[in-house]
Amino acid sequence: MNGLARAKLMDKLMTVVFYCVAGFFILLLVSLALYVIGNGFRNFSFSLISFEGSGLGNLLFNTLYLVFLSLLVSVPLGVAAGIYMAEYAKAGRFTRFLRMCIETMSSLPSIVVGLFGYLVFIVMTGAQWNLFSGALAVSILSIPLIMTVTEDAFKSLPEGYKRGSLAMGATLWQTIYKVLLPACLPRIMTGVILAAGRGFGEAAALLYTAGMSTDISWSSWNLLSPTCPLNPFRPGETLALSIWAARTEALAANSAQLANLASAILMLLVLSFSLGARCLSSYLDTKSGGSK
């Protein structure tokens, strides 16, 4: 067998290998999703997702509300930090030190972030466990991700975007706000999706900060009330925390069933949020003229 035939055979062999690897991961994801969702909705009844008793309705609301609060904090800070690193930061010791700090933050174990949040947001402030402290803890984990995605998005744009805008007399900030940022929105949305997904499934950081209460009064809309649904300074148990509690404490008779259903709901939340955000990202990409 000559060298050319050997190279073609190796090319076909590696193509088959890579297709098999891709198929394995697709099969793994589909199998996991079907198992979790099927196991969760087995013997399903609407009482399990009610907003009373041991139903998961309040936990679902707490999860969505906490993710919303964390994105309110992490998205502006992460995008601003990414813009600074891409457009304003100069090469030097300070920038290298800042990048090292960001890389360290991104690799911190969530349990360490939770303990930090407990000591700073709870103990030092004298507050009780609350959703906002949990959102801040999740934001610490999300900001490096959003910042890195934003920086990469800005640096991947053609240089002509920036030079053309500056040549027309626009300032650097006008160029960033009106030209570069809209062009980067689809990729920034990817970072937001990943950050939200981490917020949905986070448990260790919330164990020390958000609390385990499900006491919500849907007739009370006074933001100062400890049972008001929209009060960010009330304790709030999330779906991920309920899974941990059901598998460790099992206080309710149907704890295992509730844990399985909570896992299925979390899986559907992440999948639906990712698909919806992907559609929005494609729409923004098309609107900005980035689609091919």
Label the model's feature ranges:
Residues 103-141:
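Generic hydrophobic transmembrane alpha-helix motif, especially the helices
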Residues 48-54, 206-266:
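Interhelical loop and adjacent transmembrane-helix boundary motif
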Residues 70-102, 115, 123, 277-286:
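Transmembrane-helix boundary motif in ABC transporter permease subunits
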Residues 71, 149, 172-212:
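Transmembrane alpha-helices
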Residues 27-30, 34, 75-83, 112, ...:
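Membrane-embedded alpha-helices of multi-pass transport/permease systems
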Residues 61, 65-73, 77, 81, ...:
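Hydrophobic alpha-helical transmembrane segments of multipass integral membrane proteins
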Residues 2-20, 34-72, 91, 245-256:
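Periplasmic/extracellular loop-to-transmembrane helix junction in inner-membrane transport proteins
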